[in-house]
């Protein structure tokens, strides 16, 4: 299961040994670290973040040269609010290397990602679901090429099959 999770993450997000993955707490939840497994598979580095404030996140991305950050909706919203309210200025941070932000575990409002892209237009984005249900991240994910479909559940991930059934168990 763990090896498949690593292969799925690497397939979905193209991690290389040069990536630096920001692991955000709580580390007792598998999502905080299993999304890093694609980087682990390729020899990529992880940074363990202490705290989830917008300033802490941006400082870590800047100082540690993080390329991939996994967030939850509230953390992304808090970060955008801090930027909107001019509490933080992205010009104060070295963020050019940051290439991918992905979210999972809960519905993602399309307006959130649209707003995110206003500040970070070069970022790839993915939504991941199914970690708790399947012992591996990305059993269902949006896919980095499908940002126009944010809000949808996504597609079956690498090595997974999925089907939609009705109340009688019939494929629809």
Range-by-range predicted roles:
Residues 53, 74-76, 108:
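Alpha-helix capping/helix-boundary segments
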Residues 3-20, 28-68, 82-83:
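Conserved AMP-binding/adenylation subdomain of ANL enzymes
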Residues 25-28, 133, 170-171:
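AMP-binding (ANL) adenylation modules
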Residues 7, 77, 114-115, 151:
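Active-site phosphate/pyrophosphate- and oxyanion-stabilizing loops and adjacent acidic/basic residues
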Residues 163-172:
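Conserved beta-loop-beta connector loops within the AMP-binding
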Residues 41, 66-71, 80-148, 158-161:
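Gly/Ser/Thr-rich phosphate-binding loop
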């Amino acid at each position: 299961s763990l090896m498949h999770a690593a292969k799925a993450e690497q397939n979905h997000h193209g991690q290389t040994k040069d990536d630096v993955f920001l692991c955000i707490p709580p580390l007792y939840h598998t999502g905080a670290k299993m999304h890093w497994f694609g980087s682990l598979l390729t020899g990529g580095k992880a940074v363990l973040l202490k705290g989830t404030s917008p300033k802490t996140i941006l400082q870590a991305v800047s100082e540690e040269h993080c390329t991939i950050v996994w967030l939850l909706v509230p953390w992304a919203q808090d970060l955008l609010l801090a930027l909107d309210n001019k509490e933080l200025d992205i010009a104060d941070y070295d963020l050019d290397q940051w290439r991918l932000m992905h979210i999972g575990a809960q519905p993602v409002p399309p307006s959130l990602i649209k707003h995110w892209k206003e500040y970070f237009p070069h970022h790839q984005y993915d939504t991941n679901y199914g970690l708790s249900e399947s012992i591996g991240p990305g059993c269902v994910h949006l896919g980095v090429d499908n940002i126009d479909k944010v809000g949808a559940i996504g597609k079956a991930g690498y090595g997974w099959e999925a089907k939609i059934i009705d109340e009688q168990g019939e494929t629809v």
